[in-house]
Amino acid sequence: MEKDFQDIQQLDSEENDHQLIGDEEQGSHVQNLRTENPRWGGQPPSRPFPQRLCSKFRLSLLALAFNILLLVVICVVSSQSMQLQKEFWTLKETLSNFSTTTLMEFKALDSHGGSRNDNLTSWETILEKKQKDIKADHSTLLFHLKHFPLDLRTLTCQLAFFLSNGTECCPVNWVEFGGSCYWFSRDGLTWAEADQYCQMENAHLLVINSREEQEFVVKHRGAFHIWIGLTDKDGSWKWVDGTEYRSNFKNWAFTQPDNWQGHEEGGSEDCAEILSDGLWNDNFCQQVNRWACERKRDITY
């Protein structure tokens, strides 16, 4: 029996060897067919399972790493965005507070400026009033100072009048001619200022009625231009004391009066003056000239 069992095993071994040899021959034949025929369309043998499992694991790891990296990037961007948004709102709030503070400061400054302007206007009003008062006091003082010599001359004239038994007299520094007293200035004024000065002396600007009086005036006034009491401000020439102009003595220079308006001062020539050669000329009334005052000798004060 043992021999029979050994024979059976030998038989199986031979069959297996024969089958393996056949398989090898068949595989060799198939390999030869693949080599000889490039169009062989057979599927390649599949890889072992462990190798396939390892490839899938690597892909999963790569996908997981990519997802983690993407999540980190999203978190960083989100954090920066929140920080920027926070800084933006902080800056906006700061700007709003600055605008509010600046507006309040401007309003306060405007309010203080208005108060200061009011105070400044009030002070200007007070100063203007003070200036007017000072000018008024100055005019009064000037009036008294100018009249003090006049009062002194009046007393002197009255004393001379009584001492001369009623003889008429002229004040000190006045020159007598033909029953009138004349005073010649040593400085200059405009025509209106000179006329006012003579009135303060109880006199008037010089009025010339004759050739003799003209020569007397030219002799005493020197080589200066002097104002006389003749004007056409109203459109026609008139003497300040009311003396008739048309029928009275005249000594105009050639082509005068011409009312020339080409000078720089502007306006017309409405006031008469005696030139250095003794002839009369119409001139701009704001011109500064010397002048002469005249009054009757028989006036006593």
UniProtKB/Swiss-Prot annotation:
Q: Which residues form the C-type lectin domain?
A: 169-295
One GO CC annotation, please?
external side of plasma membrane
Which stretches are transmembrane? 59-79
Q: Which domain of life is it from?
A: Eukaryota
Phosphoserine is found on 13
Q: Where is the lipid attached (S-palmitoyl cysteine)?
A: 54
> Pfam families, per this entry?
Lectin_C (PF00059), Lectin_N (PF03954)
Cytoplasmic side of membrane? 1-58
Q: Which InterPro entries match?
A: C-type_lectin-like, C-type_lectin-like/link_sf, C-type_lectin/snaclec_domain, C-type_lectin_CS, CD209-like_CTLD, CTDL_fold
User: What are the disulfide bonds?
Assistant: 170-181, 198-293, 271-285
| GO biological process, any | regulation of protein stability
What keywords tag this UniProt record? Answer: Calcium, Disulfide bond, Endocytosis, Glycoprotein, Lectin, Lipoprotein, Membrane, Palmitate, Phosphoprotein, Receptor, Signal-anchor, Transmembrane, Transmembrane helix
Tissue-level expression reads: Expressed exclusively in hepatic parenchymal cells.
Question: Extracellular topology: which positions?
Answer: 80-301
Among the GO molecular function terms of this UniProt record, one is:
pattern recognition receptor activity
Membrane topology is:
Single-pass type II membrane protein
Q: Glycans attached where?
A: 97, 119, 165
Region Disordered: start-end pairs: 1-29
Where in the cell does this protein reside?
Membrane
Per its database record, what is this protein's job?
Answer: Mediates the endocytosis of plasma glycoproteins to which the terminal sialic acid residue on their complex carbohydrate moieties has been removed. The receptor recognizes terminal galactose and N-acetylgalactosamine units. After ligand binding to the receptor, the resulting complex is internalized and transported to a sorting organelle, where receptor and ligand are disassociated. The receptor then returns to the cell membrane surface.
- Summary of subunit composition and partner proteins: Interacts with LASS2.
Further information in the entry reads: Calcium is required for ligand binding.
Q: What is this protein called?
A: Asialoglycoprotein receptor 2
Organism from which the protein derives? Rattus norvegicus (Rat)
